[in-house]
Amino acid sequence: MQLKIIDQSGCLYLKVQAERIDAAAAIQFKDLMRRALTPSLQQKIIDLEQINFIDSTGLGALISLQKAQQNAAKLTTCSLHPQVAKVFKLTRMDEVFDIYATAEAALKAASAAPAFKADED
């Protein structure tokens, strides 16, 4: 499993280069993502185009990554394979993450979104 990382116009775009996120790959996936995703106000897009299978451990890894962001910007996903999109819908993960059909749509939405501001104490 590899992760292609591009910092584009203040948005962190991460393309997962693997076919599966299952029990065998979830730990590696989470480790790669945690190194790339530092809690920041930067918009983050996770491109899952090459993933054609995800199980509960993969979903758990995504939730864990979202929670690790704390007050930072919400994670966005894009380019879901139809089988992966079905799993997201059945598990209601489509209500947890913003999902876009393409990377271009996700990047356009991220660039149009107002800057995220953390609550000041």
How should each PLM-predicted stretch be described?
Residues 1-14:
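Short beta-strand/loop segment at the start of cytosolic alpha/beta domains
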Residues 4-6, 78, 100:
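General small-molecule cofactor/ligand-binding pocket signal
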Residues 8-9, 49, 104:
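Conserved catalytic submotifs in the C-terminal HATPase_c
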Residues 10-11, 19, 102:
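Beta-strand-connecting loop/turn residues
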Residues 14-15, 47:
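Short beta-strands and strand-loop turn motifs
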Residues 20-97:
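Amphipathic alpha-helical interaction surfaces in cytosolic regulatory modules
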Residues 101-121:
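A charged, well-structured terminal subsegment
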